């Protein structure tokens, strides 16, 4: 008799744990994890520019201070791209340059497409 009670209790515990796991899955699946997402959102940096302004004001540069990277360079078109792993710098002439997404293309492909677009061929 004790053996059957033990088996029944074991089966009940197993059933409860499976049900709990199932409800946790559905809770996460259908928005029950909203509280966790809100906590993650609240940890993001605010969108004001005070921190950037402080870094800009504290930067030491005798030449040109790049606005996107705060790098100190001799000329504006020498500014590096903020995300060199995924961006390619393309010099447009007249001392200007732009950073464009590489988009998975081989090196120089973005520059070629920009040049074609400037000529009206793309």
From Swiss-Prot:
The keyword Signal applies. The keyword Protein biosynthesis does not apply. It comes from the Eukaryota. Residues 1-21 form the signal peptide. GO terms for biological process: ERAD pathway. Keywords: Signal. PANTHER family: LONG CHRONOLOGICAL LIFESPAN PROTEIN 2. Probable component of the endoplasmic reticulum-associated degradation (ERAD) pathway. Belongs to the LCL2 family. This is Long chronological lifespan protein 2.
């Amino acid at each position: 008799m004790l053996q059957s009670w033990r088996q029944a209790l074991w089966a009940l515990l197993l059933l409860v744990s499976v049900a709990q796991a199932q409800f946790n899955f559905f809770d996460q699946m259908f928005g029950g994890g909203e509280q966790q997402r809100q906590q993650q959102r609240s940890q993001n940096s605010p969108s004001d520019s005070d921190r950037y302004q402080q870094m800009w004001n504290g930067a030491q540069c005798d030449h040109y201070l790049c606005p996107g990277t705060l790098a100190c360079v001799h000329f504006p078109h020498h500014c590096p791209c903020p995300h060199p792993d995924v961006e390619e710098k393309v010099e447009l002439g007249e001392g200007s340059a732009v950073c464009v997404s590489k988009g998975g293309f081989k090196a120089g492909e973005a520059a070629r497409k920009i040049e074609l677009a400037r000529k009206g061929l793309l």
